[in-house]
């Protein structure tokens, strides 16, 4: 069984910059029975790859206003893998990539949704989501909420091709003394609910002044900002540092 795993080109598969989808892929790959024949494709300028099976796809026009970065990415992927004869191609978080690769590659396709399908090009409309249900071999969601969002306006009886696979962690053998901390981890934007967190955490910190709140993550675009003496923004941290911080919270 030969498997190609395709990440979004913005998903950095490195120790220094990995976020949720890259970490999910890395963790599940390490326990896969097919890992000897599973290769992960993405785009990054860094070299500290999470696993040795990673293959980097170069993109020349990553911020071009005159050409589609996604189309260039897919074109370069096809060039890289067309002769590999993969049995399965897994695509993470980018339904539009499936639509482009399906035309060029003869493999079974699995699409993973890590975020709200209604916010992604290629799955916003009912027609687009029905097309995915018909043409994909499997659709996997990382939570029931993500699955429910996908089926808004659709008959849930069509869910026989879908499945929920939750993220997982190793159970800690040593329980550390906990501190009064509330942690937000992720992109600090509206789509991740950071605006809701902001409203809730200010009320909590006003009422319980012996607690502190921390935001771990970044966002280059316009976003909510929290102003409170007991809230601290730590920026982007490596995955291991995040886990260490959470273990004490």
Q: Where are these predicted regions, by residue range?
A:
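Short beta-strand->alpha-helix junction loop in the catalytic core
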Residues: 117, 145-146, 164-173, 220-221
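A short, active-site helix/loop in glycosyltransferases that binds the activated sugar's phosphate group
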Residues: 122, 129-161
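Glycosyltransferase donor-sugar binding loop
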Residues: 185, 198, 211-227
């Amino acid at each position: 069984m030969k498997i190609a795993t395709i990440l979004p080109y913005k998903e950095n598969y490195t120790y220094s910059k990995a976020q949720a989808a890259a970490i999910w892929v890395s963790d599940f790959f390490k326990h896969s029975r097919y890992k000897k024949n599973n290769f992960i494709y993405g785009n990054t300028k860094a070299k500290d790859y999470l696993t040795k099976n990673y293959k980097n796809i170069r993109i020349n026009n990553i911020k071009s206003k005159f050409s589609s970065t996604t189309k260039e990415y897919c074109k370069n992927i096809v060039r890289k893998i067309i002769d590999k004869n993969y049995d399965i191609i897994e695509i993470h978080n980018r339904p539009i990539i499936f639509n482009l690769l399906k035309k060029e590659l003869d493999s079974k396709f699995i699409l993973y949704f890590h975020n709200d399908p209604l916010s992604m090009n290629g799955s916003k409309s009912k027609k687009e989501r029905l097309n995915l249900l018909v043409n994909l071999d499997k659709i996997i969601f990382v939570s029931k909420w993500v699955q429910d969002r996908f089926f808004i306006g659709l008959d849930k009886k069509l869910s026989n091709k879908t499945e929920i696979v939750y993220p997982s962690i190793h159970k800690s053998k040593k329980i550390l003394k906990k501190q009064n901390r509330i942690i937000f981890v992720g992109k600090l934007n509206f789509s991740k609910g950071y605006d809701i967190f902001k409203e809730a955490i200010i009320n909590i910190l006003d009422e319980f002044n012996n607690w502190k709140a921390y935001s771990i993550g970044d966002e280059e675009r316009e976003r909510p900002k929290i102003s409170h003496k007991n809230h601290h923004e730590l920026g982007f941290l490596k995955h291991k540092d995040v886990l260490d911080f959470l273990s004490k919270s």
